[in-house]
């Protein structure tokens, strides 16, 4: 009988980051997330296994600027909102704020609508748009936001589009506003890639066992490496992306949290 937590199988011993890069040569792009099965599987299975997920949300809240004075309306934009967990966290913190949940996946927007139904219907707008195209901004209900956040979305864009999007985000920020990106970034070394994959899969296995399900490390690692959405990733190092933000005029740019390939980085618009 195999030990579900064992990492000593033939596959486990032979797996390395080079294998991962070979498997994930671009074959799909962000549109794979329009597949309802892919979106649902991430939210139901992998989202909860993200390393340091709760800490990422805590750091995000710490990075928020003070609320606008004189009871001015507060607006938050969640780009690639997924199931809406980032926006929900901020709206609970900033009571009475207005939110915009934007995603290109119909399934994700449905999940976000369900999660965010706890807020008044007029408080949250739901928008289906492709952030690969600059016209995504045309669908926004307002053109100035106190906070713009994104979680595990922008890494699906090619680098040139990432940089252009960061410029578009900067233009949409109110003076003193913040852009916070909770993101999957590229490891500097193949060793880092391998450590990330193993740590993530150990969390997946642990969660399955806690639910009374079978969780075999080698099987889950194989599934994780060969998952359909893996080849949609266009990972870029956090150092490179911080430099882009600085060049665009963001201030107090930094990586405020990082664990393997997961990072929380942010920048502000000068008052």
Q: What are the residue ranges of the model-derived segments?
A:
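A short glycine-rich, Lys/Arg-flanked "PGG" loop and its adjoining helix->strand segment in the class I
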Residues: 163-175
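Class I SAM-dependent methyltransferase SAM/SAH-binding core
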Residues: 75-79, 85-134
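Conserved class I S-adenosyl-L-methionine
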Residues: 7-71, 85-86
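Conserved beta-strand signature within the Rossmann-like core of class I S-adenosyl-L-methionine
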Residues: 176-183
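C-terminal alpha-helical "lid/dimerization" subdomain adjacent to the S-adenosyl-L-methionine
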Residues: 184-246
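A short acidic, Gly/Pro-enriched loop at the edge of an enzyme's catalytic core
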Residues: 137-148
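A short SAM/SAH-binding and catalytic strip from SAM-dependent methyltransferases
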Residues: 146-160
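Core SAM-dependent methyltransferase catalytic element
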Residues: 251-271
